From Swiss-Prot:
UniProt pathway: Amino-acid degradation; L-arginine degradation via ADI pathway; carbamoyl phosphate from L-arginine: step 2/2
Protein name per the record: Ornithine carbamoyltransferase, catabolic
Sample GO molecular function, one term: amino acid binding
Catalytic activity annotation: carbamoyl phosphate + L-ornithine = L-citrulline + phosphate + H(+)
Binding site for L-ornithine: 169, 233, 237-238
Lineage of source species: Bacteria, Bacillati, Bacillota, Bacilli, Bacillales
UniProt keyword terms in alphabetical order: Arginine metabolism, Cytoplasm, Transferase
Amino acid sequence: MNQTINLKGRSYLAEKDFSEEEILYLLDLAQKLKEKKAQGIRHRYLEGKNIALLFEKPSTRTRCAFTTACIDLGAHPEYLGKDDIQLGKKESIEDTAKVLGRMFDGIEFRGFEHEKVISLAEHSGVPVWNGLTDLWHPTQMLADFMTVKEHTGRVKGVKLTYIGDGRNNVANSLLIGGAKVGMDVRICSPQELFPDQDIVKMAEAFAEESGGKITVTSDTDKAVSGADVLYTDVWVSMGEEDKFAERIKLLKPYQVNMDLVKKTGNDNVIFLHCLPAFHDLHTTYGQNVYEQHGLKEMEVTDEVFRSKHSKVFDEAENRMHTIKAVMAATLGDLD
């Protein structure tokens, strides 16, 4: 682990703000913290700290990961849901940030507009961590790359194919994060759902520096050939439920099924998904989709989800370890 890296006092809002060395440092630190937890070694680097967890958007993994990370690090997490905070409704984000910064040592934010998390970081005076915005999902990216490294032994040069809605925050974070660390990132989606061109250009510039490669294509065969990692996400993001019929029509050819897995030509290819995944009918959501659209599986088939290729639960666990690394590195005393 690079001992010269010092992230103390930094906020973690988007991958573009961190160097390749800093991202790799966080991945190494996460691995060390995972080992400490497994061995029962205390690592209370945030002893006595108070952490605000702001959630405009509900979450299972992000909330649980930040909460358990806080407790393992010796901090006290305070959850504030959308009914507990104003954030521009009755109080400006700037004023809320200044108040929270007087009471808390660090702030996590999960919500919609990326500008809100930027404003919190600008005005609170404490480290702020992005648990998800419409634009980026940087803590997810770290968990993804930690899982990739655990199962392939590296991140540089890894061929990662994201297939599905290429405009969403996960695709954006994989593009920029992968470009930063020298991955061969392929985004495969229908042209209507290609990533924002400005983000693609940014990724291409970072890839040129790191030795990575960026491809955006609608050709599934080309995108998955030789892939080490197949990644997908939900076809309809939170707040877009009215677009179900349109998205199903667009994205059905981009479903991750066993035929697509075999087209990679890599028997050891791993499958990742940030979850929740709609791979069966064991949810109310899945039942509704089946009744309205006749689909039993959406972005990934149950066969792939439950196969040897699937590492989604390693990935989910790694949310905790990587979030812990971000918090410890930016707020703790690691000396």
